[in-house]
Amino acid sequence: MLRQFCIQVVIVSTQSKANFTPRRGGFTFKQFFVAHDRCAMKVGTDGVLLGAWAPLAQAQRVLDIGSGSGLIALMLAQRTAENVQIDAVELDEAAAAQAHDNVLESPWSLRIQVHAQDIHHFAQHHAGQYDLIVSNPPYFEPAVACRDQARHNARYTETLTHDALLASAEQLIVPQGTFCVVLPHDIGEAFETNAHRRGWHTAQRLNVSDRADTPMHRVLLALTRQPAEEATEQKLAIKLADGSYTDDFRRLITDFYLFY
């Protein structure tokens, strides 16, 4: 029997902005801290990119699929108005519990609800509710299992295939909504092709490389069910030759990273 729990956050922060200093056991942002010691997948550049880049439009209901530590949900809470509600769905109970704790510590504790359950079950009860859906999904095909089952589930597509992810998004999204993902570049190409086959349209695409002279290694996609009036495709190099961040990357993350 599938064990489920839903965490309703009920603590109100007394300040809209926090003056954070770096802490151990997680990642410190300008307005919030993300502990990730109980999560299989730690805070990384992929999640930060998606949280900072995802187009918001006029989204009132937001869903983060496979939320992990709650990183992307927290970033989107920072970027949106006080009336925007965010649901974060995470299959792993330890990660969901840590996401819950991270939300409680944040300034947006009334706006984020963490659900520890399978997205397929969640979709059955929340069909057609979300203007914006985001996901930093697993992408490795089944192979040699990790010793850590939670890490295996977070990295491999056995618990959430990309076809199943698209099907869930189709069920959950409103007709004019946007579904955003971040994936390795080659896997993202296949994901985009499959999405088009299923009736999705690419509204925005961001191709990411470590440096301007290196191959693209990540792609961020914003998909819609309706054809985009004007689809856009951009490139982003994260670092310069000397290892420092590019101006484009700094602009993207300036509201989040402590020292920019």
Curated annotation (Swiss-Prot):
It is an enzyme of class 2 (transferase). Its EC number is 2.1.1.223. The keyword Repressor does not apply. NCBIfam families: tRm6a37MtseTrmN. Keywords: Cytoplasm, Methyltransferase, S-adenosyl-L-methionine, Transferase, tRNA processing. It is found in: Cytoplasm. It comes from Serratia proteamaculans (strain 568). GO terms for cellular component: cytoplasm. The lineage of its organism: Bacteria, Pseudomonadati, Pseudomonadota, Gammaproteobacteria, Enterobacterales. Transmembrane segments: none annotated. Pfam families: MTS. It catalyses: adenosine(37) in tRNA1(Val) + S-adenosyl-L-methionine = N(6)-methyladenosine(37) in tRNA1(Val) + S-adenosyl-L-homocysteine + H(+). InterPro entries: DNA_methylase_N6_adenine_CS, SAM-dependent_MTases_sf, Small_mtfrase_dom, tRNA_Adenine-N(6)_MTase, tRNA_adenine-N6_MeTrfase. GO terms for biological process: methylation; tRNA processing. Belongs to the methyltransferase superfamily. tRNA (adenine-N(6)-)-methyltransferase family. GO terms for molecular function: nucleic acid binding; tRNA (adenine-N6)-methyltransferase activity. Specifically methylates the adenine in position 37 of tRNA(1)(Val) (anticodon cmo5UAC). This is tRNA1(Val) (adenine(37)-N6)-methyltransferase. The keyword Transport does not apply.
